[in-house]
């Protein structure tokens, strides 16, 4: 075996372009550094929002479905307003506060998100703040015939805005995957009907933005799934697959049907103030998707 004449790691780095630090003249201590963001002047416009986006961070969620508590990964957007006389914000404070909440066992709920958003505005010394987070939510599901258990999932989201004059506004959301079977295909065909995976996205606001004993994730999930041709399952054996196939055939749905039926459930929920429903089907006989949307406010 041949042995190479091997340079040291320092020499290797030098050979590949690394250079020693420059003996600079600018200060290295925070107290001596210029703070451009805090230099007051007339900067022409106030900003609606400024901050950080696409921040991945672990967080805890609770649910009325098993597992009742789980750690997931949230994707956060943290922003605040900015006054005309301020050049910028101290963005490091945004992730500092998120880490502080994480260390205390931050549970993602509407109530806790309101507290976090208000703290964010105060920490940043701004009159408003906005927090948006999306996260995967996992829940146990049994197959329809043999009761085989597996973990299904949906994409959940929380939006909270705080304004020191107007107070809080909020919106919750969920995207659930379902099966939709085409009513037209069933009607015109001697046998069978094309079906596909559909994605139902619901956004809702409540009269009272507290979860209490109700889990908004479950509320939105049931509104979407209970109106589909069939729901999706992580584990299916042959008897289960037969049950799923037949149920879908018995409950054909257009995208138009899905948004209207889902909206009817949301309308009947007395805690919900306003909502938007979208259904997007990945058409199995086309290269395009089918889509329908509906918005309603009970004001």
From Swiss-Prot:
Q: In which pathway does it act?
A: Cofactor biosynthesis; 7,8-dihydroneopterin triphosphate biosynthesis; 7,8-dihydroneopterin triphosphate from GTP: step 1/1
Catalysis performed (reactions): GTP + H2O = 7,8-dihydroneopterin 3'-triphosphate + formate + H(+)
Source organism, top-level taxon: Bacteria
One Pfam family of this chain: GCHY-1
Keyword Repressor (UniProt): no
State whether keyword Hydrolase applies: yes
Q: Which UniProt keywords apply?
A: Hydrolase
InterPro entries per UniProt: GTP_cyclohydrolase_FolE2 (IPR022838), GTP_cyclohydrolase_FolE2/MptA (IPR003801)
For the site May be catalytically important, which positions are given? 182
Q: Which GO terms describe its molecular function?
A: GTP cyclohydrolase I activity
An example GO BP is: tetrahydrofolate biosynthetic process
The UniProt record lists the EC number as 3.5.4.16
Q: Which stretches does the entry tag as region Disordered?
A: 1-25
Hey, which family's this protein in? Belongs to the GTP cyclohydrolase IV family.
Biological function: Converts GTP to 7,8-dihydroneopterin triphosphate.
Q: What's the protein called, per UniProt?
A: GTP cyclohydrolase FolE2
